[in-house]
């Protein structure tokens, strides 16, 4: 129930499909990027800028973003709270 999340440069992901947002600095994540690239599941949406976060989806896709993981996480939380506000309003109207 996270809606659509802006991950920078006009790129959007479906929040409910994301399973992890991680920093790309560790060696295991660098290997994960290579594997995703070999499988055709790497999406680079950083417009040539330094990759600051990998977004891993439930379909096995790895999305490289130039936005910090903390910023993307904050966007997730804000979307969640916004959706909850709307749902609370609807619940009150129904009852």
From Swiss-Prot:
InterPro entries to which the protein is assigned, alphabetical: RemA-like
Pfam families: RemA-like
HAMAP family: RemA
Protein family according to the UniProt entry: Belongs to the RemA family.
Name under which the protein is recorded: Putative regulatory protein Pmob_0099
Lineage: Bacteria, Thermotogati, Thermotogota, Thermotogae, Petrotogales
């Amino acid at each position: 129930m996270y809606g659509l999340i802006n991950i920078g440069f006009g790129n959007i992901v479906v929040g409910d499909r994301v399973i992890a947002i991680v920093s790309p600095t560790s060696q295991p994540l660098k290997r994960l990027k290579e594997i995703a690239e070999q499988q055709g599941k790497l999406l680079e949406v950083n417009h040539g800028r330094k990759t600051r976060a990998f977004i891993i989806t439930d379909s096995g896709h790895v999305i490289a973003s130039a936005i910090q993981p903390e910023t993307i996480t904050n966007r997730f939380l804000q979307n969640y709270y916004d959706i909850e506000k709307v749902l609370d309003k609807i619940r009150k109207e129904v009852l």
